[in-house]
Regions:
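Short C-terminal tail/terminal secondary-structure segment
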Residues: 2-4, 244-270
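Conserved glycine-rich cofactor-binding loop
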Residues: 11, 18-19
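Rossmann-fold cofactor-recognition segment
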Residues: 46-60
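C-terminal helical subdomain
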Residues: 102, 162, 167-170, 189, ...
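Short, small/polar-rich loop/turn modules that mediate ligand/substrate recognition or access, typified
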Residues: 181, 186, 243-245
Length: 270
């Protein structure tokens, strides 16, 4: 394949590379010549440069992986995530955000000038503006342990742990953009609409089909993992060299329809 994306020989770190969007992106990155260091609790099938078994809700596990990663990194992809239910509210927040944030907070000093960070949020997190004070309050807890303690003591966590975790990713992405720009490092996230993954299969096993169908785009289908993986790979590439600080809905126009009043705003998108 052409090297227009600029991945040949690049050192790329990715969480959540075993399944779904992360697996699709990992396959593409290997094809594009990147050296991929994959972190996941499950086996990774893509022929990555190195696989590090990692539990993203366990600080010791994450720190052990960090110690094995290269001293210079070109791109970091945060793709690990679980649905709630069936995962507990606590585990959902720990994996989807607390562990997710711990990794880039440790690795950002290693990201080269011109490098990039990209994470998977969700259209379920698009109500972040209406919950900004609470999100910022959580982000102000700068350590892994402080976040863990807050989550254990929060009686409201179970109501929407998944949505809150994705709101945190979106706000975290935007808050870091200015500081990282001084080093010419970019940071972005994507908000997928429902996607045909193992993740979605688990979610649909816990929720009635009627609860998920209203969030399907007007093209009438869920996205494929590869359709999301391609966007991630693009955002980390040289072709996206001036894109930073944005959350990009990858939803075939779902959020646009909500904004134009053409669909009910079921997720309080703002």
């Amino acid at each position: 394949m052409s090297d227009a994306l600029g991945y040949e020989g690049k050192q790329v770190v990715m969480t959540g590379a075993a399944t779904g969007m992360g697996a699709a992106a990992a396959e593409l990155l290997v094809e594009l010549g990147a050296e991929v260091f994959a972190l996941d609790i499950a086996d990774v099938k893509a022929p990555v440069h190195r696989f590090l078994r990692t539990d993203m809700k366990n600080r010791e596990s994450i720190d052990s992986a960090i110690a094995e990663l290269p001293e210079e990194i070109d791109v970091l992809f945060n793709c690990a995530g679980v649905p709630h239910p069936p995962a507990s509210a606590f585990d959902t927040m720990m994996i989807n955000f607390v562990g997710l944030r711990h990794l880039p907070d440790a690795l950002l000093p290693r990201v080269r000038q011109g490098g990039a960070v990209s994470s998977i949020a969700s259209t379920a997190g698009m109500a972040w503006k209406t919950n900004l004070d609470r999100v910022r309050g959580f982000l102000a807890l700068e350590t892994f342990e402080a976040g863990e303690t807050w989550l254990k003591d929060d009686p409201e966590l179970g109501a929407d742990a998944y949505g809150f975790s994705k709101q945190c990713i979106i706000v975290y992405t935007q808050e870091l953009a200015g500081e990282l720009a001084k080093r010419e490092v970019r940071i972005t996230c994507i908000s997928p609409s429902p996607t045909d993954t193992v993740f979605m299969t688990k979610l649909m096993g816990e929720m009635p089909k009627e609860a998920i169908e209203p969030f399907t785009p007007s093209n009438g289908r869920f996205a494929a993992s590869l359709e999301m993986g391609r966007v991630l790979v693009l955002l980390g590439s040289d072709l996206a060299g001036f894109i930073s600080g944005v959350n990009i809905p990858v939803d075939f126009g779902y959020c646009a329809e909500v904004a134009m009043g053409q669909r009910d705003n079921l997720m309080n998108i703002s």
